[in-house]
C-alpha cells in the first residue's frame, strides 16, 4: 500500500493519485493540513521536506515526490 501525503488544491497530489490509479496501485491519501497534529507528524516523518506530495510505502520506505513516484513505478514493472 502506498501512502500519499498532500494538501487540498495540490496539482501534483492529484497527478500522483491519477498515476497510481493508472498503474492499479492501492493508496491511502493523507491531508497533512487537516489538523495541526497531522502537519507535525508530516514534518517528523519527512524531516527537511517542505513539498507535497510525498509518497511512502506502508513499511516506511520513502519514495519521494511525484517525479520520484514516476521513476519508482517504471522500475517496479
Residue ranges and their predicted role:
Residues 24, 56-57:
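Short glycine-enriched loop/turn motifs at secondary-structure junctions
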Residues 57-77:
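Non-catalytic, surface beta->alpha helical segment in thiol-disulfide oxidoreductase systems
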Residues 11-14, 37, 64:
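Residues that form or flank phosphate/diphosphate-binding pockets in enzymes
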Residues 6, 31-32, 36, 59:
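Short loop or secondary-structure boundary microenvironments that flank
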Residues 46-56, 66:
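Structural micro-motif
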Residues 27-29, 62:
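Conserved beta-strand scaffold positions in the cores of enzyme catalytic domains, especially
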Residues 32-49, 75-76:
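Thioredoxin-like thiol-disulfide oxidoreductase module
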Residues 1-25:
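Local sequence-structure signature of Cys/Sec-based thiol-disulfide redox active-site neighborhoods
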Amino acid at each position: 500500500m502506498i501512502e500519499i501525503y498532500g494538501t487540498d488544491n495540490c496539482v501534483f497530489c492529484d497527478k500522483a493519485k491519477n498515476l497510481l490509479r493508472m498503474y492499479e496501485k492501492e493508496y491511502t491519501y493523507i491531508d497533512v493540513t487537516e489538523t495541526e497534529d497531522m502537519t507535525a507528524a508530516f514534518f517528523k516523518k519527512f524531516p527537511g521536506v517542505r513539498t507535497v506530495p510525498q509518497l511512502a510505502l506502508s513499511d516506511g520506505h520513502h519514495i519521494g515526490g511525484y517525479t520520484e513516484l514516476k521513476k519508482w513505478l517504471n522500475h517496479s514493472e
